Regions:
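HTH-adjacent hinge/linker in prokaryotic transcriptional regulators
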Residues: 2-5, 15-23, 28, 34, ...
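Short glycine-rich, polar/acidic loop-and-turn segments at beta strand-coil junctions
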Residues: 62, 105, 126-127
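Conserved phosphate- and dinucleotide-binding cores of soluble alpha/beta proteins
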Residues: 2-5, 9-12, 22, 51, ...
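Short glycine/serine/threonine-rich phosphate/pyrophosphate-binding segments
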Residues: 106-110, 213-216
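Hydrophobic alpha-helical segments
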Residues: 36, 79, 83-87, 126, ...
Length: 253
């Protein structure tokens, strides 16, 4: 088989399946593994596919999303998954913890399941603050500009205020997760607050259902591969987006 024919078939396989192992390509083309590896290196340099450990993934899989969904729509989506994620995350809170809770429907889903005593919370979400207060938890709400679309409080003053806190544990939401760009959100001001909050937490968990994998929004708030992720599932179809994130950093209820 000619080189151009191999290239065409490899691209076709990768785009059809999302990701393909080197050995599978070798068997399909009836070509040596060494030849396939050279082909993958060249196709990667041409930006036709993405070479990953043990194979290749499609560069077409990542979905750029330019518009943030309204909060009322987010609340009604993936409810069971978010409740499962929320319950798992809530169990990580211990007595006397000082907790940061970011905006986000998965983070908000934690609240009914929190069972720790003598715990204090800081949040930049008015909705989370109200729900925590309704359960008689001690809550501090950050100052700043109110963003009605998400119920978040954001801005430079919010970030400055965060610098005065040292959290034992923090929980953040993400609109998108993709290995090249990390954790993303549509709003620069929200991204600034998320980044600053991460720097003030001893332990950080990102809560995101599997629909967030492969989506890219305008602003990255972290590219740290050591951030711990709590999600509802992580099959081969979603792993291709987060291969650089170590499997011992994923938690699936």
């Amino acid at each position: 088989m000619l080189k151009e024919e191999r290239f065409s078939r490899i691209i076709e396989l990768v785009n059809e399946r999302g990701s393909v192992k080197t050995v599978e390509i070798s068997e399909d083309l009836n070509t040596s593994l060494a030849t396939v590896r050279r082909d993958l290196n060249e196709l990667d340099s041409l930006n036709k596919i993405k070479k990953v450990f043990g194979g290749a993934s499609s560069i077409k899989n990542a979905q750029f999303v330019g518009i943030e969904e309204k909060l009322e729509n987010k609340i009604t989506k993936n409810i069971d998954q978010k409740n499962s994620i929320g319950a798992y995350a809530a169990a990580l809170i211990s007595d006397y913890d000082f907790v940061y809770m970011d905006t986000g429907t998965s983070v908000e889903a934690m609240i009914p399941y929190i069972d720790a005593n003598n715990t204090s919370f800081v949040t930049n979400s008015i909705y989370i603050a109200n729900k925590l207060s309704a359960r008689d938890f001690k809550v501090f709400i950050l100052p700043g500009e109110f963003k009605s679309e998400t119920g978040a409080i954001v801005g430079a003053s919010t970030c400055d205020y965060l610098d005065g806190f040292n959290f034992s544990i923090g929980f953040l939401g993400a609109n998108g997760i993709q290995e090249e760009v990390g954790f993303t959100t549509p709003d620069m001001n929200e991204a600034m607050v998320k980044s600053r909050a991460i720097s003030r937490c001893k332990k950080v968990y990102v809560l995101a259902d599997s629909s967030k994998f492969g989506k890219i929004f305008q602003v990255s708030f972290s590219k740290d591969p050591d951030l711990e992720i709590i999600t509802d599932s992580l099959g081969d179809d979603t792993k291709i987006y987060v291969r650089k994130y170590k499997e011992d950093k994923w938690y699936i209820p």
